[in-house]
From Swiss-Prot:
Pathway: Pyrimidine metabolism; CTP biosynthesis via de novo pathway; CTP from UDP: step 2/2. The active site is at residues 381, 507, 509. The gene is pyrG. This is CTP synthase. CDD domains: CTPS_N, GATase1_CTP_Synthase. One of its GO terms (molecular function) is identical protein binding. UTP binds at residues 13, 188-193, 224. Its EC number is 6.3.4.2. Allosterically activated by GTP, when glutamine is the substrate; GTP has no effect on the reaction when ammonia is the substrate. The allosteric effector GTP functions by stabilizing the protein conformation that binds the tetrahedral intermediate(s) formed during glutamine hydrolysis. Inhibited by the product CTP, via allosteric rather than competitive inhibition. L-glutamine binds at residues 354, 382-385, 405, 462.
Length: 546
């Protein structure tokens, strides 16, 4: 039978519950315990698929096509496992399921209430994860902050859960903030005391306190928290601010988080095999070259909108013993006159995914700048579509080449709606979503990077390259380097005569890992590093001559 850890958060939002859950998953997995992590989100949307990135950050897509919270990306990257739609639960999906059951008569005419019907549905979703993969430990993060009205049904459900499955099979872990007050020159525990008091009023006594803080918790403060919150002092864990999220697992290991969790669950201690993770951190902390990469997007004011892209770039940089400096460029600011000012001097340009016409012209201009100036370029999803539009307009000389998404009556719709999307009315969960196979051209750069003929990548789109233009694009120098196995859908394009110009219809960033950088991001960063070294060499030669 699986054991269960519930991670709640107090005092403020965005405190790092997801990173704590992911880090605990890493530490337990390093001890050869199997782990699955799920997120309970208190918003009433069925999923985040139709939410603005400014509201929610990126939408993370799983192998089975679920549109989920970005925390699932952290879970997958830290534990190196593939999750599914079972690992993402929202209030909206719970109420939808309950109401569907009511319409079918499943409640036998009874009055449908939050307790027991909604709470039972929540508990069933948690148990479903345990039944699906039978992990040793299921870690559940409850979104929001203790005290929020939206989270109450989830908190009530996990309160009941310990009674249902047994006291020794459940751990309640509360992540809280210990603020540093500069004027007083001390850290304050009162917000945490009140947060725990709020949690107790719901009927949950935390077993472990994970204290987010700017400075290490001194023994006296740990003892104070232990006394006022009724938590053993060894279960008061310091989660000090770190320069990288990938340092957090090792920091929490030093604090004994995994050991305390296993003791509370009556599971035996095991030696943690963290050598690979320790090597990763050593590489991060002693980088060589610094590479400047421009991300040209629509939502650059909120970095979380492109979180997996940023992490995939970091993974590739770590593997190359380098570090990256990001130049965030709003696509709306890029035009013929400003492209040079925004993009000059960068070592590589990434145009990530997105939806809608706003900023598209700027993305197209940035792609032209990368192509003409031989700057390594990686386009993702809409980034591929924009690169096709750019080539159609500027090289193939197609009048008003465009996507039918942006211009319905364009005479040259080089990007068109997928046929199966023609009759789709609802927006949520109706795109081409999830893991699909892609067959690579053996004579392509993509093939040399992946090292295999058939690959699998995650998708999230409605539009594709219009095959009516495939021959023309090939004749003018474009290479289709990856397609669906039947050859119908173009999945990867590249420019053979460019230092590195690859664009994909899929989202490779979702399958990158800290210890296994994605091949396309690795290839892109290698090209960026090579370009920088060549520029440095050329600059040195000029200096020597002068």
């Amino acid at each position: 039978m699986s054991k269960f850890v519930f991670v709640t958060g107090g005092v403020v939002s965005s405190i790092g519950k997801g990173i704590v859950a992911a880090s605990l998953g890493r530490l337990l997995k390093s001890r050869d315990y199997s782990v699955s992590i799920l997120k309970l989100d208190p918003y009433i949307n069925v999923d985040p698929g139709t939410m603005s990135p400014f509201q929610h950050g990126e939408v993370f897509v799983t192998d089975d096509g679920a549109e989920t919270d970005l925390d699932l990306g952290h879970y997958e990257r830290f534990t190196d496992t593939e999750l599914s739609r079972l690992n993402s639960v929202t209030t909206g999906s719970i109420y939808q399921a309950v109401l569907n059951k009511e319409r079918r008569g499943a409640y036998m005419g009874g009055t449908v209430q939050v307790i027991p019907h909604v709470t039972n549905e929540i508990k069933e979703r948690i148990l479903r994860v345990a039944k699906d993969t039978n992990p040793d430990i299921v870690i559940t993060e409850i979104g929001g902050t203790v005290g929020d009205i939206e989270s109450l049904p989830f908190l009530e459900a996990i309160r009941q859960f310990r009674k249902d499955v047994g006291r020794n099979n459940v751990v309640y872990m509360h992540v809280t903030l210990i603020p540093w007050i500069p004027a007083a020159k001390e850290m304050k525990t009162k917000p945490t005391q009140h947060s725990v008091k709020e949690l107790r009023s719901i009927g949950i006594q935390p077993d472990v306190l994970v204290c987010r803080c700017h400075l290490p918790l001194q023994p006296g403060l740990k003892e104070k928290l232990s006394a006022f919150c009724d938590v053993p002092v060894e279960s008061v864990i310091t989660a000090q601010d770190a320069s990288s999220i990938y340092e957090v697992p090792l920091n929490l290991e030093k604090e004994g988080l995994a050991q305390q969790t296993l003791e509370l669950l009556n599971l035996g201690p095991r030696y943690p095999h963290l050598e690979e993770w320790e090597n990763l951190i050593r590489q991060m902390q002693s980088p060589g070259q610094k590479l400047e990469i421009a991300i040209v997007g629509k939502y650059v004011q909120l970095g979380d909108a492109y979180l997996s892209v940023v992490e995939a770039l970091k993974h590739a940089a770590i593997a190359l013993n380098s570090e990256i400096e990001l130049r965030w460029v709003s696509a709306e600011d890029v035009d013929n006159d400003s492209a040079e000012a925004h993009l000059s001097g960068v070592d590589g340009i990434v145009v990530p995914g997105g939806f809608g016409i706003r900023g598209v012209d700027g993305k197209i201009k940035a792609i032209e700048y990368a192509r003409v100036n031989n700057i390594p370029f990686l386009g993702l999803c809409l980034g591929m579509q924009c690169s096709i539009i750019e080539w159609g307009r500027n090289v193939a000389r197609l009048e008003r080449a465009n996507s039918s998404e942006f211009e319905e009556d364009t005479p040259n719709p080089v990007i068109n709606l997928l046929p199966e999307q023609a009759d789709v009315v609802d927006l949520g969960g109706t795109m081409r979503l999830g893991l699909y196979p892609c067959r690579l051209n053996p004579d392509s750069l993509a093939f040399s990077l992946y090292g295999q003929e058939v690959i699998y990548e995650r998708h999230r789109h409605r539009y594709e390259f219009n095959n009516a233009y495939r021959s023309l694009f090939f004749e003018t120098g474009y290479l289709v380097s990856g397609t669906s196995p039947d050859g119908r859908l173009v999945e990867i394009i590249e420019l053979p005569k460019h230092p590195f110009f690859i664009a994909t219809q899929f989202h490779p960033e979702f399958r990158s890992r800290p210890n296994k950088a994605h091949p396309l991001f690795s290839g892109f960063m290698k090209a960026a590093l090579k370009g920088r070294e060549e520029k440095f060499s050329l600059s040195s030669q000029h200096s020597a001559v002068s």
